Every structure is written in structure tokens, then in C-alpha cells.
Amino acid sequence: MNLRPLHDRVIVKRIESETTTASGIVIPDNAAEKPDQGEVLAVGPGKKNDKGELIALNVKVGDRVLFGKYSGQTVKVNGDELLVMKEDDLFAVVEK
């Protein structure tokens, strides 16, 4: 199954954080916080302004983005846990 986001929504896959600290302590899954970074997998066409003109999104497929820990709606697709969220829920694009 493929998802095609509508309007100003994006599909994001969380990027898992390290499960071992710098000192070598292993953090169990249930104690680890949800990561707040992800990779954009798909973007919608954008949203319309007051004049009816389509405004494209600022993010693109492949961008690494920052978002709130509880942002978006979680969906499972082909065994992967993905997030569907509005572009407004994104805080920043991580530049390489």
C-alpha cells in the first residue's frame, strides 16, 4: 500500500535514536523517548491561499525534519510505523 498525502500534509518516518549512551549504557525500548527527527517520505501538493492559488510545500522527499514528540497521526503501512502530519507541525529541516 502506498500513501499519497493530500493538501499540506507530509508522510514522515521516524529516525530511531541511539539505544546506547556514550558511556555504553543500553537504554531499554520502554525507557527510550520517541525520536523527534524523521525523514520525509511523501509530500502533498500544497494548500490554496485566499485567491485559490496552490502554494507548494517547503519540504521535499528525503528531507530530515524536526517535529514535536506527539506530532501527527501514527499509521502502519507494510509493517512500518509512519506519521501523517501537516507541514505546520514541522519545526525545521536539518541541513547536511
Curated annotation (Swiss-Prot):
Q: Where are the transmembrane segments?
A: none
Q: Its principal location?
A: cytoplasm
Q: Which residues form the signal peptide?
A: none
For this UniProt record, the keywords arranged alphabetically read as follows: Chaperone, Cytoplasm
Question: Pfam families from the entry?
Answer: Cpn10
Q: Does the keyword Isomerase apply?
A: no
Q: Which InterPro entries match?
A: Chaperonin_GroES, Chaperonin_GroES_sf, Chaprnonin_Cpn10_CS, GroES-like_sf
Per its UniProt record, what SUPFAM superfamilies does this chain match? GroES-like
Q: Name one GO cellular component term.
A: cytoplasm
Q: Which GO terms describe its molecular function?
A: ATP binding; metal ion binding; protein folding chaperone; protein-folding chaperone binding; unfolded protein binding
Where would you find this protein in the cell?
Answer: Cytoplasm
In terms of domain of life, where is this protein from? Bacteria
Q: From its record, what is one biological process in GO terms? A: chaperone cofactor-dependent protein refolding
What protein family is recorded? Belongs to the GroES chaperonin family.
Protein task: Together with the chaperonin GroEL, plays an essential role in assisting protein folding. The GroEL-GroES system forms a nano-cage that allows encapsulation of the non-native substrate proteins and provides a physical environment optimized to promote and accelerate protein folding. GroES binds to the apical surface of the GroEL ring, thereby capping the opening of the GroEL channel.
Assembly, in brief, is: Heptamer of 7 subunits arranged in a ring. Interacts with the chaperonin GroEL.
Name recorded for this polypeptide: Co-chaperonin GroES
Source species: Acidovorax ebreus (strain TPSY)
